[in-house]
Design a protein with these regions (language model features):
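Metallocofactor- and cofactor-centric catalytic cores in central/energy metabolism, strongly enriched
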Residues: 1-202
Length: 202
């Protein structure tokens, strides 16, 4: 669904429709794990992590927040009602109070995404400029470890005189020779009970 939303947010027809409603264009931002996916594959900016999802609504600049089946704070519904934000759920097993439900289905993904993007555009006119506050804090990040990302990193450390460039061969050689004895994935959402990213950095 996120991929299709990105497609329609970039569609010239939808952009023209947004401009006809007074917007400068369409901005899609991601939160949590889906954010990592669309940031890695499409360069879509991240608005925050799991713990920051409510802050996205608090900016007053979010026309719609769309969720699927996990990592959803129950307060998003009531919070969205305090602003103009449309809170949209897309999974029948994760419908929530104070949300609008658009059932996502792979067979109708394009239709679902177009409806969601149009709903967000139509909601732009309800934005209250006096409530909009977008923090100017920005942070660089490396997101996603696709094969392409790994190859790029490996090319940066490989010896161009002897190593084959543009492949995962340097990593494979390090693993098979025992230089690298394993890999660890540090994954999971932050927990409101502990300091953010505590499990990852300490």
């Amino acid at each position: 669904l996120s991929e299709m939303i990105c497609e329609y947010a970039d569609d010239p027809e939808m952009i023209a429709y947004a401009k006809s409603k007074g917007a400068k264009g369409i901005t899609v931002s991601g939160v949590c794990c889906t954010s990592n996916e669309v940031a890695m594959r499409r360069g879509i900016p991240m608005a925050g992590n799991f713990l920051q999802q409510e802050n996205v609504v608090l900016t007053g600049a979010c026309e719609a927040i769309v969720v699927d089946v996990q990592c959803i704070f129950p307060a998003l519904g009531p919070l969205s009602k305090c602003f103009h934000t449309k809170f949209i759920t897309t999974s029948p097993i994760a419908q929530m109070p104070d949300s609008e439900f658009i059932r996502f289905n792979a067979a109708t993904a394009a239709e679902n995404a177009k409806a969601i993007v149009k709903m967000a555009i139509d909601n732009f006119e309800n934005r209250k400029p006096e409530l909009v506050h977008i923090p100017q804090m920005k942070q660089k990040a490396t997101v996603g470890y696709s094969v392409e990302a790994l190859v790029k990193v490996l090319d940066g450390v490989a010896n161009t005189q002897v190593d084959e460039m543009g492949t995962t061969k340097p990593l494979i050689v390090c693993i098979t020779s025992g230089v690298i004895r394993g890999a660890v994935a540090m994954v999971g959402c932050n927990n409101p009970k502990i300091r953010p990213d505590y499990a990852h950095i300490e």
